[in-house]
Amino acid sequence: AIAAAGFDGIEIFEQDFIAHDGDPREVGEMIRAMGLEITLFQPFRDFEGLPGPLRNKAFDRAERKFDLMQELGTDLVLICSSCHPEALGGIDRAADDFRELGDRAAKRGLCIGYEALAWGRHVNDHRDAWEVVRRADHPNVGLILDSFHTLSRKIDPETIRRIPGDKIFFVQLADAPAFEMDLLYWSRHFRNMPGEGDLEVTAFMQAVMATGYAGPISLEIFNDQFRGGSPATIARDGHRSLVALMDDVAHSEPELPAVAPAVPARAEATGIAFLEFATKGAEADALETLLGTLGFTHSANHKSKALSLWTQGDIRLVVNRETKGYSSSAYTMHGTSVCDIGIAVDSAVDTVTRAQALGSASFAQPIDPGQLKIPAIRGQSGSVLHFIDDKSGLSEVWGIEFTPVATADRGTGLTRVDHIAQTMSYDEMLSWSLFYTTLFDMKKSIVVDVIDPDGLVRSQAIESPDGALRVTLNGAETHRTMAGTFLAESFHASVQHIALATDDIFATAEALAERGFSALPISLNYYGDLAARFDLDHAVLARLRAANILYDEDAKGAFFQLYSQPFAGGMFFEIVQRTDGYGGYGGPNAPFRIAAQKRLIRQKGIPKK
């Protein structure tokens, strides 16, 4: 998996080797046959500072590991700072131990790398580890740096710049969410790829590169979500994270030596250009009826395909009834679902170029004469994203490929796509987050818990700086939740709900009611609680209750939410209004919305048809 993802080498973790039943020479040959090298053997623990017989035993253990390294075919071992209860402190004592071990390693053509564990007994800071290496003054003894061990202890990474690059033998990288907990537990369970957490990994790597370091850049990740994950996905995410990280380093400090080919900058997304539904037959008819009820106009048909365009404000929804090609396959797999997301960007070509550099596969289908070739990639879970820009004429696709059939009226006051909500297994959330934040200029919010009557759903918002593109990721941990049921029944379709913006929620609610829109009925108890939580005028509260509108506030403004009833296996529409810069997504209302939806959907065990 890692060879296919584009990596050059692999570390051998001792526990993995011990669990393997193969000969070390066989392991080495297998790795090299895949075009990889063994860059490091690790970890060798509790070496330095031991007294008397314990010291002799430590050297004996080291010699045995040297034997193993030579059979594997690697020349560098990581020795982490000692946690042994009988280890003695002292920089000079440790330096003497490493100088002697360096002599032994040199006789075999091997090298020693010393790493400061964040929880080491006497050495837990890379500055102290460097001082040990400096005083050992041996060509076969160098420093190993690990971003987690430095950043978790809030050590300034700028101190790395004072270390000679040729004395740094190896660099390991890991990010992590900003938790306050025991360092060892944090490290063993919550490390993740650079960019997936909250540590200043870019600043760390800038400091490393400023030393002149030219050695391997590795990932050392311990994470409960990864342990049972797909090796191919994890490897691709790891490579993606390193490409994005080194690109960030290059842009942050251009004078540093380049370590990777230049790629276009993160794409500036200006919004959702279109959403395309794969559907057929009676399900397509029902979807189009719902769109009409929402105030959309069937404004155009594709000139050569079974595609209809539905518009309102700046919103474009495409209903695809094709019986062959990607959309037909998507329908067969997922049922009625969003099969394609069109994103408006500053440069479609540059966006795809960056996506490919990050490991995404391009996507293309045969096109008819007169059609535009719109750049596209495969996203997460096999989804497709097309990119549209103004400068290349791609935004003219609606006039070029579609024939008008009606003129859109005002509809119900919907103006644009506020956000889309994508659902995935919780174990896949980090991968989805990394996909968006490395490809687009987007920032992620903290992960929050959404209470479902049947379990927890983890939710994270990812936004462009101006809010033009907003995506919420919802990670389901059990199939019993609303999100989990959607995943199970749609075979992992991604878009579960589409939030559409209005400038006047009450006028929109009235217009929807006139068209026969069936709003999600909200419990009257909700509005009693709302009156207690917020200082709302009685008349406003009555209008909210009458229209089944939910309400929230933050420090800046207010948020109004109106939901459709679920359709097509658990998808739904949301109509929202933001006032005065409200920046959230109505999170406090989610449990009440989910409970209302669950009262309407069919019970588990009852077949669809």
Language model features by range: what are they?
Residues 11, 40-42, 78, 113, ...:
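Conserved beta-strand positions in the central sheet of alpha/beta enzyme cores
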Residues 37, 48-143, 152, 233, ...:
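Active-site acidic/histidine proton-transfer and metal-coordination neighborhood
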Residues 29, 60-62, 86-87, 96, ...:
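Extended, hydrophobic interaction surfaces within ordered domains
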